[in-house]
């Protein structure tokens, strides 16, 4: 077993207990998803106040809910198409709230440059999700690109715990631009190839 595998097993032990408890108490996975977004709003508020470490801790808690909701759905046989839709919509609210918290902070500090960087990072972060959703309405899969939501959340946590959030916004922004471009090009090629096959 690798070191990361061992760490994964250790971390999963308490999460399995939480998942089992939620299933036993018949807590609906959609409820867990909603609790997660409320906790992320609290993290956004902490960011707005400049309390980065507090925000980082709250984000860790919020993402426990984000992780277990799907597991609880499987364990309790409550998987549904609406559940997947609900999860995606709530994730967008969670993401945007974190960006808005930072924008509020930087605006209060009169750091117009950081406000612009964060706003652009937010815009392209939203576009990474939109381009994939729109592409997958036309082609089977569009999972290309590096900057998915899990990577964004990890970067947010790194920025919070290291007090380097402005640098993290640059990283998220740049990688999101490349991800959006990659998905546009990939979708174009897939559609072009499909049209050539039909022709």
Predicted feature residues:
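A feature for the membrane-embedded catalytic helix bundles of lipid/isoprenoid biosynthetic enzymes
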Residues: 1-19, 89-199
């Amino acid at each position: 077993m690798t070191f990361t595998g061992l760490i994964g097993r250790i971390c999963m032990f308490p999460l399995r207990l939480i998942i089992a408890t939620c299933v036993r108490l018949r807590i609906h996975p959609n409820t867990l998803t909603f609790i997660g977004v409320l906790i992320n709003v609290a993290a956004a508020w902490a960011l707005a106040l400049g309390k980065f470490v507090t925000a980082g801790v709250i984000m860790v808690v919020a993402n426990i809910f984000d992780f277990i909701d799907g597991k609880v759905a499987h364990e309790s046989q409550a998987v549904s198409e609406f559940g997947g839709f609900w999860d995606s919509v709530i994730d967008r609210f969670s993401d945007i709230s974190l960006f808005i918290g930072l924008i509020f902070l930087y605006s209060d500090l009169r750091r117009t440059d950081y406000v612009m960087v964060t706003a652009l990072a937010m815009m392209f972060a939203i576009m990474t999700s939109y381009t994939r959703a729109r592409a997958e309405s036309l082609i089977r899969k569009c999972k290309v690109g590096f900057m998915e939501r899990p990577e964004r959340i990890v970067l947010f946590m790194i920025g919070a715990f290291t007090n380097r959030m402005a640098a993290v916004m640059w990283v998220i922004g740049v990688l999101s631009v490349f991800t959006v471009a990659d998905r546009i090009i990939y979708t174009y090629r897939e559609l072009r190839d499909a049209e050539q096959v039909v022709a």
